[in-house]
Amino acid sequence: MNIKKFAKQATVLTFTTALLAGGATQAFAKETNQKPYKETYGISHITRHDMLQIPEQQKNEKYQVPEFDSSTIKNISSAKGLDVWDSWPLQNADGTVANYHGYHIVFALAGDPKNADDTSIYMFYQKVGETSIDSWKNAGRVFKDSDKFDANDSILKDQTQEWSGSATFTSDGKIRLFYTDFSGKHYGKQTLTTAQVNVSASDSSLNINGVEDYKSIFDGDGKTYQNVQQFIDEGNYSSGDNHTLRDPHYVEDKGHKYLVFEANTGTEDGYQGEESLFNKAYYGKSTSFFRQESQKLLQSDKKRTAELANGALGMIELNDDYTLKKVMKPLIASNTVTDEIERANVFKMNGKWYLFTDSRGSKMTIDGITSNDIYMLGYVSNSLTGPYKPLNKTGLVLKMDLDPNDVTFTYSHFAVPQAKGNNVVITSYMTNRGFYADKQSTFAPSFLLNIKGKKTSVVKDSILEQGQLTVNK
């Protein structure tokens, strides 16, 4: 038995009893000599107070994903027989869309609609200047089945699916892909992974000529970011926990290379567990709000989910050869709020750093947020490493609440910075996979989001073509 862990649980139990009896802080201090604590661990937090403001705030149309006309939505013609969902463009170091020999490139997850385990990365491309969804061509799968074995990597050989990531156009004209190696063989082990993708160009097409320098980068250290062994030790799926270490997003700053990614906090920066419910830093606002909200949470059916909620947008520094150089603190964490903040995305715009993430209401512990609610949250800082403050006072940037069965349901919203101006293009996928015989998961119509300092708003009447990446304004 872990005596330290047992002692910590006993302390928490005493405080829980005191709170339920209405004694709050004074009773707890008298019985155990300890008090509710406030520990930020030197990172920014998505607080319960901010999130509780969102159900009212989201009624404003400037935060709402536009309504789309289902009769105009097309499957991707070059992806016949495939659902296509999470996607990301080949980007320059500053986040703008790269021009690769006259083409824009998008990497996307795709698979057989009838087989939920069929998840691989495909490469799509479109001539610069074209915007129609029918102009997207399909170069096929990035990786051959044999590549993971040929890489001579002990983690890669157990990969069963390829999950989301990012891609950068390097200064020497190469395509460097980052993605998530998912292994169904090891309780959902997830590993940040990279490869150079060799692509040849002609006047009419792009062709994948294999990959090289294919290797694992990071699978969690346990201290800063939860690893799969901790998930297993605590009961794996039966525990109700949700282990994440995925969606690597590449970014450069001042000559340094980094990955920002979805994760869960580790044992040294605010781990999951009942004791986390008594950290004032996770609640925000004031001590009186903490007392009221913590008592309510302790008596609610969301208590167990909140205990396990320790989502984070993590960060590591890379060497020039894209190996791990340094494990860094998370940019932001969502302890007690949600265990899952996805599709990490960060870029510099007009002198500020903007950090975005997608999340589902069904994974949250906030009153007033429903299981159908879909969000893109956003944060702003003067530096890449933070501290980050919520955009629009709460972090709400986009909200969508369509039934998952709706053809125009969208998720995986991704902000693409433009070369000029204050608008970014929002891409996403439309239609959940495997729901319809004739409607596949496809590129959703893009639209514009305006960013000015600490505020954002959806630009009215700004719906673009399906999968459109850039605007000439």
Curated annotation (Swiss-Prot):
| Cysteine disulfide links | none
Q: What is the effect of changing residue 361 to F?
A: Drastic decrease in catalytic efficiency. Reduces affinity for sucrose. Synthesizes mainly oligosaccharides, but can still catalyze the synthesis of low amounts of levan
Q: Please indicate if the UniProt record lists Glycosyltransferase as a keyword.
A: yes
How activity varies with pH is as follows:
Optimum pH is 6.
Reported effect, residue 429 to N: Drastic decrease in catalytic efficiency. Reduces affinity for sucrose. Synthesizes only oligosaccharides
The catalytic activity, as recorded, is: [6)-beta-D-fructofuranosyl-(2->](n) alpha-D-glucopyranoside + sucrose = [6)-beta-D-fructofuranosyl-(2->](n+1) alpha-D-glucopyranoside + D-glucose
Which GO terms fall under biological process for this protein?
Answer: carbohydrate utilization
Could you name the domain of life of the organism this protein comes from?
A: Bacteria
- GO molecular-function term, one example from the UniProt record: levansucrase activity
Effect of altering residue 363 to A? Answer: 2.9-fold decrease in catalytic efficiency. Synthesizes only high molecular weight levans
| Quaternary structure annotation from Swiss-Prot or TrEMBL | Monomer.
Q: Identify this protein by name.
A: Levansucrase
What is the species of this protein? Bacillus subtilis (strain 168)
